[in-house]
């Protein structure tokens, strides 16, 4: 039986643009998460959905060449970052996962709030992206 080669030029071209927009939205949700709905979990899921869109438009081999990352290591790094953020409060004699924040004057952004909760959210973000992509790639692999 001959396999018919499909022409997915429109899907692949649209995916490049849409994936970028989805990643920007994911970044926005990640940064607004401590003041509004969003954060590391939702941002990570949306980032994973962007990568899944790439997997649908292209194939697993192409996406792996674009993102040569072992996602299980991404999840491990995120878990380590989240735990270290929580343990870091012990250094200051505070309970586990006690967070603090401060306002800093940054060159282009002006007065900006920087919080340790953002570092914890980054850990959650990495764990969610790592685990969801590991599961999806494992399911999508050929035997």
From Swiss-Prot:
Belongs to the CPA3 antiporters (TC 2.A.63) subunit B family. This is Na(+)/H(+) antiporter subunit B. GO terms for cellular component: plasma membrane. The keyword Nucleus does not apply. It holds the Pfam family MnhB. It comes from the Bacteria. GO terms for molecular function: antiporter activity; monoatomic cation transmembrane transporter activity. The lineage of its organism: Bacteria, Bacillati, Bacillota, Bacilli, Bacillales. Forms a heterooligomeric complex that consists of seven subunits: MrpA, MrpB, MrpC, MrpD, MrpE, MrpF and MrpG. Mrp-dependent antiport apparently occurs by a secondary, proton motive force-dependent mechanism, but the similarity of several Mrp proteins to membrane-embedded subunits of energy-coupled NADH dehydrogenase complexes raises the possibility that there is a capacity for electron transport that could provide a primary energy coupling option for Mrp functions. It comes from Bacillus subtilis (strain 168). InterPro entries: CPA3_antiporter_subunitB, CPA3_sub_B, MnhB.
């Amino acid at each position: 039986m001959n396999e018919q080669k499909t022409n997915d030029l429109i899907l692949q071209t649209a995916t490049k643009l849409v994936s970028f927009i989805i990643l920007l939205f994911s970044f926005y949700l990640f940064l607004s998460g401590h003041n509004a709905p969003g954060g590391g979990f939702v941002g990570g899921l949306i980032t994973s959905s962007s990568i899944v869109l790439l997997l649908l438009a292209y194939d697993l081999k192409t996406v792996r060449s674009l993102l040569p990352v072992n996602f299980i290591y991404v999840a491990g790094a995120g878990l380590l970052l989240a735990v270290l953020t929580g343990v870091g409060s012990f250094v200051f004699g505070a309970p586990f996962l006690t967070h603090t924040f401060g306002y800093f004057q940054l060159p282009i952004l002006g007065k900006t709030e920087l919080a340790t909760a953002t570092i914890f959210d980054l850990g959650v973000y990495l764990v969610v992206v790592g685990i969801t992509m590991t599961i999806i790639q494992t399911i999508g692999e050929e035997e």
